[in-house]
Amino acid sequence: MQASLEDEWLWGWDATPGIVSVWAERTGRAVVWRRAAGSDTLTREEDRFRPWLLLPALDDLTHLGARLLPEEAPGAELFDSVAWRELTGAGQFRYLVSASDSRTLEAAVLAGASARLKRQITRLADLGDEAALSLPPEEQYLVATGRTYFGGLAFDDLHRLQFDLETTGLNPAQHSIFLVAVRDNRGFSAVLDVAERGLDGPAAEADLIRRLVALIRQRDPDVIENHNLHGFDLPFLARRAELLGVTLALGRIGGGLRRRPASRGYGPWRGAEADASERDEARGRYTVAGRELIDTLDAVRRYDFAARDLPGHGLKAVARHFGLASPDREYVAGAQVYQTWLVDPARVRHYALDDVNEADGVARLLGGAAFALARMAPRRYERLADAGPATGVLDPLLVRAYLRAGAALPARSVSDGVQHSGASLYLFAAGVATRVVKADVSSLYPSLMRQYRIGPASDRLGALLALVDRLVEQRLAAKRRARAAPPGSRERHTDEALSAAMK
């Protein structure tokens, strides 16, 4: 395989620099924001793409008649036409179908499937994983164009803003926001509270939320961050805004916050007593046009998965561990913050600013992992930050590789029923061990895959092994850099986080 093609599989092929956010819509409209390296110059570009799906056959589209056309045929680009291209090889997903609007495309597939199955099908997901492969609009755009985020940018080139809510309690249906601390990496900081404008009750809180929205729009960051952002701040803010009738127009275009699914989640009201709707709420994440919403708790968990040296995952514990806490850091017990505010508001303002300063510090130390992955994978930065290594990173890379090669994608594999015991474990001695020396094989399983060329039987392109080769090389290089860097340095933590992300 030519090295240049393998490079395209890993890095994409469109080297457009400085992409800091992509927002794509089902209509085929894509908006791309780009930042010039080393400056605050931001540009917005609009682009068009054809929303697409992967199907195993065209059976559910034949009812379109003359509106179903090979993509090279005259008229295939028309609004009401569906274009198709047959991919090479014997993979499950052999047909790439596209239309000018994803609603047109999905409606056509669902109509055909409903007629074939003699029951009403309203969602592609109801057809099962083997019937269609669909990606979110932004990923469709990035896969089709070969673009990725952050080309030519350093992490500090991003305009990053942190905000932290202080609330009267943890339940947004019963409690309220009384203070918000805000800072960014351009030297700005502020504390907003309900007392400073002479308003009372719900009117004061609604005014506070409106001022927060206006401030974020005025500062115009590429990235919004906090610790437990998706687990507390955003769901609490969204619920309070809904109850107060305030629009959270936090994006660069369009409306307010939108929810997106995530494989894992956390929130202050989850637990054994939570009902199904509350658990779904905890698993959800948020997204907004033109800005990436990053939860530093994800970076902490990813780092500790490999390092296993953190005393806890809470912001204060992590900040102390990494030496980010300032000497005059203000600490207030969570349950006492509101009561402290009533008698000593200056102390709570100090405390809240310390929180956002530490969230920024954690992001700078550990954010390099997701930042590096976003240069490779055709996925929004915010989704890579909370994704696992398999479905989160490798899956979009493999989809892009196969489509770039014009090859049919293999089916999702199912178990062959064979029981596997996993790695071997032996006990050679019992008792208290002294003078222990650790023996470790770096990237053991990927190294075995590389050495013996072990890969999925269905991966006829060898794309997974090619990607693993490149990723392992980068991971081992990051580990070497981390070991060579001074203990506790930003460089060391960044490379450790990058190594963990590629594990």
Residue ranges, per PLM feature:
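Active-site-proximal helix-loop-helix substrate-binding element of RNase H-like nuclease domains
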Residues: 190-192, 198-203, 220, 224, ...
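Common nucleic-acid-contacting/processivity interface regions adjacent to the catalytic cores
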Residues: 2-6, 335-443, 447-450, 489-503
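Short helix/loop capping segments that flank catalytic or ligand/cofactor-binding pockets
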Residues: 170-171, 190-191, 235, 302-304, ...
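Core structural elements
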Residues: 28-34, 147, 228-229, 322-329, ...
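Conserved catalytic core of nucleic-acid polymerases
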Residues: 136, 439-503
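A contiguous, basic/glycine-rich beta-loop/short-helix subdomain that forms a polymer-engagement track
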Residues: 124-158, 411-428, 434
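Short secondary-structure boundary/capping segments
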Residues: 177-179, 235-247, 311, 377-380, ...
